[in-house]
Amino acid sequence: MAKEFVSIQIRHDMEARTLELTQEDYWVKAVERFKEFLPRAGPKERLVPLSPADERLLVEPSEEEMAEASHLPYTSLLGVCQYPSAYTRLEMRYAMSILSRFRTKWGKKHFEILVKTLEYGYATRKMGLKYDGNQAGDKTNVLEGYADSSLSLPRSQGCRTVVMNNAAVSFTSKRHTTTDDSTAAAELTEQYLCACDVEGYRNLMQEIGLMQDGPTVIWQDNQAAIQIAMNRGALAKKTRAMEMRVMTIRNKIEDMKVVPMYLRTSEMIADIGTKALDPKLFIYLRDKLCGYGKE
């Protein structure tokens, strides 16, 4: 197997049954390229790519602020940070989603926050995605889905991921294309999208001879969305505005392809793609998402 491919370092230990994908060299080159915007002592140690405090500062800049920061290479640095977030640094996807909204109009504060994201990537450059084929019990090559959403107007921010062998094989963090009128609706939208992703991966696994025994679990931290999907409880009938999504999920449940189950928010790894988190929770969820968490 190649040791490097499109700037991704590949470490495959056949005896240990592990596969690790990192971009350490990429981050070193990125810091060298933008070193004039970093402290003289070098990049600072950052624990998160985007802090809750910095997220609150990301508002549309004034004309004066845009003119003052027009010389700063915001779009270039944004592209440099986006590339790893698409392949090996999935935990950075939410930060990139937010910062990308200012690609045509940014101020000095936006650029400074983007530089912090670069510093985070460099500080954690040895990390990536680590897959482990030695899963306890019957979890080897078993798919699991995680779906979460943060209700906001005009469109909610959703995140979903599919995990296999201790790390993510699919990860999406983006705003919904429709307006959600409740938390349950937002969560159900993400559950529906995750169920579609899961079905695609189940079909792929079947084609290569890795059959899934039973339905794939989709973990969620919203009981109302689960009850609606399972056609249980008082909310099950109040789904007119979500009819297509609800029927699709219920059909997949009946066909034994997926089953939604509850997981408390502190363990919900998809939460990392819905909002900026404090360092302790972020690191815990990041390690579980990327394969570095201890079971």
Give the residues covered by each predicted segment.
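Long, low-complexity, charge-biased intrinsically disordered regions
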Residues: M1-E295
